[in-house]
Swiss-Prot record:
Name this polypeptide is given: Endochitinase
Enzyme Commission number(s) of this protein: 3.2.1.14
GO biological process, one term: polysaccharide catabolic process
SUPFAM superfamilies for this protein: Lysozyme-like (SSF53955), Plant lectins/antimicrobial peptides (SSF57016)
Molecular functions (GO terms): chitin binding; endochitinase activity
UniProt key word Signal: yes
Residues of the signal peptide: 1-21
Span of domain Chitin-binding type-1: 22-62
Chain's role: Defense against chitin-containing fungal pathogens.
Top EC group: hydrolase
PROSITE patterns (alphabetical): CHIT_BIND_I_2, CHITINASE_19_1, CHITINASE_19_2
Length: 322
């Protein structure tokens, strides 16, 4: 009788915990857990090994514990360093002039508890460098002979240039709003309704009806890029897990040449177009930004920067092409 009572109490406790937990991950349209908690494979938020261990979906570092003294992101990347890295983002020739603010970046970063809080100080700085490098490539206004070099011109562009289409794919879950277009905007140049929808749901903002918030609100703009950065989509790991060393490649990954490093992040973002066919100028541009930012931080880049010999992960529902 006592044994049956204990089992019943345990079951009820689990039900109470599950009933009170917030849905997250693929079960909730890519939603992230509050406070940097882990999202378990079942779509529940928490910080236990069951949440943060095998098959954890996002923010798998859990609620960050207090880091080394001075590890707050404003100490890792003060305003002066941010301005040095994105040296020409406010140049008069840049369409995104005065939009990508330091305060917007910091506000967005602090809303993702595991970003730049995982690992030692060098690992945290390396994550910032990798994030800013990949997004600098997506928004670059640089050219080979640009003043201060091509890798000083990240975050120049805000909206996709030319005459972009609607990027509307019929979807019952993420229906396109009348008259709205889902072309590239912001640091990651997020595209398509099936990306704006889950990003907005995760952030608590209606981006299907208001996609231009990504180009008018700096914090939301950075948050969409960080949402992409922190969110895995099988078989792709999250960029966060790769750069912080939390991702262990499977046998299939290894046979495809996908080893931990900056190159896998390029594969996650745009591998179908840029990886697996030897040298690619776009890949080299990403690496160029990354090396410069790591140099400014005074840290190493790690190994496996290129993806020329990696097979693509294949098409996913997150941002497939930029």
């Amino acid at each position: 009788m006592k044994m049956r009572y204990c089992v019943l109490v345990s079951v009820l406790a689990i039900l109470v915990i599950r009933g009170s937990a917030e849905n997250c991950g693929r079960q909730a349209g890519g939603a992230l857990c509050p406070g940097g908690q882990c999202c378990s494979k079942w779509g529940w938020c928490g910080t236990t090994p069951d949440h943060c261990g095998t098959d954890c979906q996002s923010q798998c570092g859990g609620t960050p514990s207090p880091g080394p003294s001075g590890s707050d992101i404003t100490n890792l990347i003060p305003r002066s360093t941010f301005d040095r890295m994105l040296l020409h983002r406010n140049d008069g020739a840049c369409p995104g002039k005065n939009f990508y603010t330091y305060d917007g970046f910091i506000a967005a970063a602090r809303s993702f508890g595991a970003f730049a809080t995982t690992g030692d100080t060098d690992t945290r700085k390396r994550e910032i460098a990798a994030f800013l490098a990949q997004t600098s490539h997506e928004t670059t206004g640089g050219w080979a002979s640009a003043p201060d070099g091509p890798y000083s011109w990240g975050y120049c562009f805000l909206r996709e240039q030319g005459n972009p289409g609607a990027y509307c794919t019929p979807s019952a879950q993420w229906p396109c709003a009348p008259g709205r277009k889902y072309f590239g905007r912001g640091p990651i140049q997020i595209t398509h309704n099936y990306n704006y929808g889950p990003a907005g749901k995760a952030l608590g903002v209606d981006l299907l009806n208001n996609p231009d918030l990504v180009a008018t609100d700096p914090a939301i703009s950075f948050k969409t890029a960080l949402w992409f950065w922190m969110t895995p989509q099988s078989p792709k790991p999250s960029c966060h897990d790769v750069i912080t060393g939390r991702w262990t490649p499977s046998a299939a990954d290894r046979s495809a040449g996908r080893l931990p490093g900056f190159g896998v992040i390029t594969n996650i973002i745009n591998g179908g177009l840029e990886c697996g066919h030897g040298s690619d100028s776009r890949v080299q541009d990403r690496i160029g930004f990354y090396k410069r930012y790591c140099q400014i931080f005074g840290i190493g880049t790690g190994d496996n920067l290129d993806c020329g010999n990696q097979r693509s992960f294949g098409s996913g529902r997150l941002v497939d092409t930029m």
